[in-house]
């Protein structure tokens, strides 16, 4: 039986959803038996607030670009349909899941309940005392990432799928 997994990443307006920060991009890439299938989900979102300057420096998604994008509630069903019951593979899962579950709550939806593999926690177990951010893992495992000048959720999921 084929095993379906989804590599998932978000970009956000800041680092803490409890301070009102929101998701501004979702990227997800499908794996079947640990191989990229080509199926993906990407959505930019209007957070109805500005990004913190540090977050903007990381992702480069401006208010002007995001203002015409849908809100999370408008795309929640399509996002959940793409995920299905697949295991989620996320680098620093508590961060992304905190934001996504908050967005789902605001949209009147149940939180994500899929199995989750946190690749950051896994990397810390495998490489204690070393840097384990995505760029460091790319260098360690010889995964090409020179085209990654800014963080983008879909780009980061594609890179993480290669690392995984």
Q: What residue ranges belong to the model's regions?
A:
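Acidic, divalent-metal-coordinating active-site segment for phosphoryl/phosphodiester hydrolysis
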Residues: 152-164
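Conserved non-catalytic scaffold segment of RNase H-like nuclease domains
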Residues: 1-114, 124-128, 132, 136-150
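Short, conserved phosphate-binding/catalytic loop or strand-edge motifs used
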Residues: 117-120
């Amino acid at each position: 039986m084929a095993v379906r997994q989804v590599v998932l990443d978000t970009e956000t307006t800041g680092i803490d959803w409890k301070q009102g920060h929101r998701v501004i991009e979702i990227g997800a890439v499908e794996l079947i038996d640990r191989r990229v299938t080509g199926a993906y989900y990407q959505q930019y979102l209007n957070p109805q607030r500005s990004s913190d300057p540090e977050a903007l420096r990381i992702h480069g998604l401006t208010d002007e670009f995001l203002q015409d994008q849908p809100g999370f509630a408008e795309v929640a069903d399509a996002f959940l349909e793409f995920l299905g019951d697949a295991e989620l593979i996320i680098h620093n899962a508590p961060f992304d899941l905190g934001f996504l579950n908050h967005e789902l709550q605001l949209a009147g939806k149940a939180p994500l309940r899929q199995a989750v593999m946190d690749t950051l926690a896994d990397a810390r177990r495998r490489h204690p005392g070393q840097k384990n951010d995505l760029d460091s893992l790319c260098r360690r495992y010889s995964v090409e990432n020179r085209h990654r000048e800014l963080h983008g959720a879909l780009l980061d999921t594609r890179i993480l799928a290669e690392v995984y």
